[in-house]
Amino acid sequence: MQQQAYRAHDELPYMGMDGDSSYSPALAAVAGAVALVAFCSYYLAVTRATGDGEARRRRRRHPPVVGGVPPAHTTFRLLATPGRRNIYTCDPAVVEHILRTNFPSYGKGPLNSEILNDLFGEGIFAVDGEKWKTQRKIASYDFTTRALRDFSSDVFKRNAAKLAGVVSNHAASNQSMDFKGLLTRATMDSIFTIAFGQDLNTLDGSGEGRRFAKAFDDAGEYLLLRYLNPFWKLARLLNVGAEATLKERIKVVDEFVYKLIRARSDELSNTMAQDHRSRDDLLSRFIQATTSDSGTVDYKYLRDIVLNIVIAAKDSTSGSLAWFLYMACKRPEVQEKIFDEVMEATNAGDSASIDEFLTSLTDQALNKMHYLHAALTETLRLYPSVPLENKQCFSDDVLPNGFSVSKGDGVFYMPYAMGRMEFLWGKDAEAFRPERWLDEHGVFQQESPFKFTAFQAGPRICIGKDFAYRQMKIFAAVLIRFFVFKLRDKKDNVSYRTAITLAIDQDLHLTATAR
């Protein structure tokens, strides 16, 4: 199990191993120099942190944890650029400090905002201060309304049924399916309908919808390259390489989205002139909430706020569901436990059709599915949607473990690494075990959000957490109620790709058998 769990780490690109002809002494020398610089930076950072007078006075003393990483070594510092350092941590106390205790001193910062601006704009995930507070207030209200909850549940069920139909056709012909692609399209269709009030139909093969979805995904990947390329601004100025491609993808996204916003704004203007009924999608709600007294609509603001929600919802749920099915295939007994729980909670009967089953899949039934909730949470522990989360320090600070932080420094906490730390989760931290989330009565028990950080914590905790769980539970319940899933080939190696979110690399080929 541990070998499988570490496989993703072992597949990082390498050169010169085992007599590979690509080996070069010059390359080895460069690699050695980089390693030496990294080690020296780490050593000096630790020495400096432990030597600061104020830091030493505030330094916490931790007892050793058997079988785990000593807490004193769960935070380290590396030199990023001249005058700026990055601090990385897996310490829940530090996470709590930056996300809640000293929240005003940490945020996205100008560096992240500048890198993400072309796609995220001034949306909620790329801004701080009053802009963030305003959007948070509007979005928080909408995500708690009964109308949106009912509307989104209907959309989730409709798209889960469409996905089940696609799976049924493949199962009847004994064909394997790429579930990563299917889930990406199904969840994109769902969130797009909820956000914009229009069916994208990528699961059915709509040309325009798929073109938008492809451009949308590509733009996210090209944005990530900016973190790795210090010369991205020059490339953007010259309109070459990845920046040229990113510009093309953003153009496709913007043309599609602005057309929808203008059409919806005109529709609402005409509708409100006749009656006071409102639509349930987020775009309509935001238009009504942000339109000025003079009737002016800020299309750019609406584009940013709604696209940010689409980005968060689509990537988190599709990726998590893909990892969930992968782990369920590795642990067939988990599938059967979920099936038994779903059947008991819905009480739909063995012969129920998909429509009859969806009718029985009420909020009350979903709330009874503690084991399914635990299995999804265990998936997020091992494969969080965002594997590395960064903040920028706005004022000099000292962390609870004694590290000094200067204004402008980056502070990173690592959900992926934290989910695999033995000092946090025990000796079986690498194992997929949903039972760790259940009490002796089989009832789901939540962990501290500063230990289980998949949804952030503090004032910026994910407002769509319940929304995401509801979508994942509906999709998972429908799929496992009607099908048994297996990996196409047990030897298929599944690892992650480098991106803003922790998605499965390449495809996830599964076979399905109707129950």
Where are these regions (language model features)?
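Cytochrome P450
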Residues: 2-38, 79-87, 147-158, 168-193, ...
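Central I-helix of cytochrome P450 enzymes
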Residues: 187, 191, 249, 253-257, ...
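Conserved cytochrome P450 catalytic core segment spanning the I/J/K helices
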Residues: 144, 188, 248-321, 349-362, ...
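Cytochrome P450 heme-binding "Cys pocket" and the immediately downstream C-terminal segment
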Residues: 332-334, 411, 465-503
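Conserved cytochrome P450 K-helix/beta-meander segment immediately N-terminal to the heme-binding cysteine loop
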Residues: 413-443
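Conserved cytochrome P450 K-helix E-x-x-R motif and the immediately C-terminal K′/meander segment
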Residues: 67-74, 255, 259, 357-403
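N-terminal membrane-proximal hinge/A-helix region immediately C-terminal to the signal-anchor transmembrane segment
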Residues: 2-134, 155-166, 249, 391, ...
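Cytochrome P450 catalytic-domain helical core, especially the substrate-recognition surface
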Residues: 32, 64-67, 84-85, 93, ...
